[in-house]
Structures are given as structure tokens and as C-alpha cells.
A protein has these predicted regions:
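Short aromatic loop motif centered on NTY/YTY
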Residues: 201-255
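Extended soluble regions of mature proteins
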Residues: 181-203, 231-237
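Short, surface-exposed charged micro-motifs
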Residues: 76-78, 184-188, 221-223
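Sec-dependent N-terminal signal peptides
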Residues: 1-18
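Extended interaction regions within the primary functional domain
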Residues: 8-11, 88-90, 227-232
Length: 267
């Protein structure tokens, strides 16, 4: 009796197909790591309420030598997100300090205003992104290209590292001036496929009006934690340096979140 495999082989020979390929079992394609991560992040819908105490520390500097100007400070507040939207709350002491700095600065423009400037540094959309880091990551992954996947421990625990080529969004004017752009991202995944941490580095060089060269570098780092159906960025560091047209500057910031118990709504 002729077996099923033999019949398949004879059919392949008759059709001119590769008999080896016809006799070999089908091999399932390897899953795309980016698609796998996108699917895992899609399950983190950030639908449950969340409340966190946050602090933002910043340091900005522009110029060099005697013309260098530095400002630095730190502010703390509370952020919460629920079905009703996002709410940012500042303590009375923080607001009182900012008002006091404004009054003293009005009398003497040389008086620093670290608290007032710190309040201006904090953006509601950035806090929302910290409470829903999965959504932000999905947007970036949609434009990223996989470079490498390897096993690499993170904080002493087994983890898988994805190395990505990023595609930062540039406006038409920026695309005209930027001649070189290198953007690399790294994401460490835990055993459950959920991100533990991430890093990004963007280096751009260009020229304006053929004679004015410029260079900018952006470095960012995140630490994540899964809380219910949320991926929360418990820590985010951002460093930016730029130079051009005889000037240079640097901006550093670090945002830290401490999750708080969510108070259920009253009857």
C-alpha cells in the first residue's frame, strides 16, 4: 500500500515542485517581537483609576563662561486619572512658595524662582503618559524597526532585550535642516513579555543657511511597573544637549512617581 507521504512525493514530482520541500513538515514562522510586544501592551488599557505622588527635578543651563545662565529646582504634587479625566493637584505650600518667588522677583529680577519655574516645567500630558506608558510605547513601536533581540539580565533578573531603530517625527522645516539623524531605542522585557525598562538616544546634526551648523542629543530612560491594567513609568529621566550658532545649552529632568491607594468613590 502506498503511504500518504509517498503520494505527496509522487504528486510533487509530477508537478515539478521541490520534492524535499513537499515531504518536509511545515515550519511555523517565528513571531515578530515587535508585534508580540504590541499585543501585550494592547491588553494594558489603563481603564482602572490611578493616583500617584510625583516629584520633578530639573536643571537647565544656556551659554558658556560668564554668560552662562543656570536654573534648577524641584516641585512635588499629586496626579490622578479616572473615568472623569486627569487631575493635577499642588499643595498650598508649593503655590505659596511660587507666589512669594514671583513677588520677590518682581522687586529684583536677579532673584531666582525655582518653584515657579518648576511648576511651568510640569505638563499634564506628560504626567498622563507616565500613568499610561503602554499607550506611549505602542505609538513609538508603530514606527520602529527591529535591529536585534538578545537575552540580557536586568537588575540581576532574566530579561529579553529588544534593540530598535526609532523614527522620530520631524516637521517639514526640521527635515530640511537635519542632515544626519541617528535614533536607537532599547526595551527590556520580563518573563511575562511586559517592559521593565527602556532607553532612547537621538543624535541629530544639521545646517541652517549653509553656514550655521548645529548638533543636538537627547537621552531618555524609563523604569516601568505593571499595576492592574496599567503600565506605569515610575521614573523617567530626560537629558538634552544642543549647540549651534555660537551658543550651547543643556536641560535635565527626572520625574518620579509613587503610586498611592485609590480611594473608591462614595455612595
Amino acid at each position: 500500500m502506498i503511504s500518504t507521504a509517498s503520494l505527496a512525493l509522487l504528486a510533487a514530482l509530477a508537478s515539478g515542485a521541490d520534492p524535499v520541500a513537499a515531504a518536509s513538515p511545515a515550519i511555523a514562522p517565528r513571531p515578530d517581537p515587535i508585534a508580540e510586544l504590541q499585543a501585550a501592551l494592547a491588553k494594558l488599557a489603563a481603564s482602572t483609576p490611578a493616583t500617584a505622588r510625583f516629584s520633578v527635578r530639573y536643571e537647565n543651563s544656556t551659554g558658556e563662561g560668564k554668560d552662562q545662565v543656570k536654573v534648577a529646582g524641584e516641585v512635588s504634587g499629586e496626579v490622578s486619572e479616572s473615568a472623569g479625566g486627569l487631575a493635577v493637584r499642588w499643595g498650598r505650600a508649593v503655590l505659596a512658595q511660587a507666589h512669594d518667588e514671583e513677588r520677590r522677583h518682581a522687586a529684583d529680577p536677579e532673584v531666582p524662582t525655582p518653584t515657579r519655574d518648576g511648576l511651568a516645567q510640569v505638563q499634564a500630558i506628560e504626567l498622563a503618559n507616565r500613568l499610561d506608558a503602554a499607550g506611549t510605547l505602542r505609538d513609538e513601536l508603530a514606527k520602529a524597526t527591529l535591529v536585534e533581540v538578545r537575552e540580557e539580565p536586568f537588575d540581576g533578573a532574566p530579561a529579553r532585550l529588544l534593540v530598535l531603530k526609532l523614527a522620530p517625527a520631524l516637521q517639514a522645516r526640521e527635515r530640511r535642516y537635519v542632515k544626519e539623524l541617528d535614533a536607537v531605542g532599547k526595551i527590556w522585557l520580563g518573563a511575562d513579555g511586559i517592559p521593565l525598562a527602556a532607553e532612547a538616544r537621538i543624535l541629530g546634526k544639521g545646517r541652517i543657511f549653509l553656514v550655521i551648523g548645529f548638533e543636538t542629543e537627547i537621552r531618555q530612560a524609563w523604569r516601568f511597573a505593571r499595576v492592574g491594567d496599567r503600565l506605569v513609568a515610575l521614573r523617567h529621566e530626560d537629558e538634552r544637549r544642543w549647540s549651534g550658532a555660537g551658543d550651547r545649552g543643556e536641560r535635565k529632568s527626572a520625574t518620579v512617581l509613587e503610586l498611592l491607594p485609590v480611594t473608591p468613590p462614595g455612595p
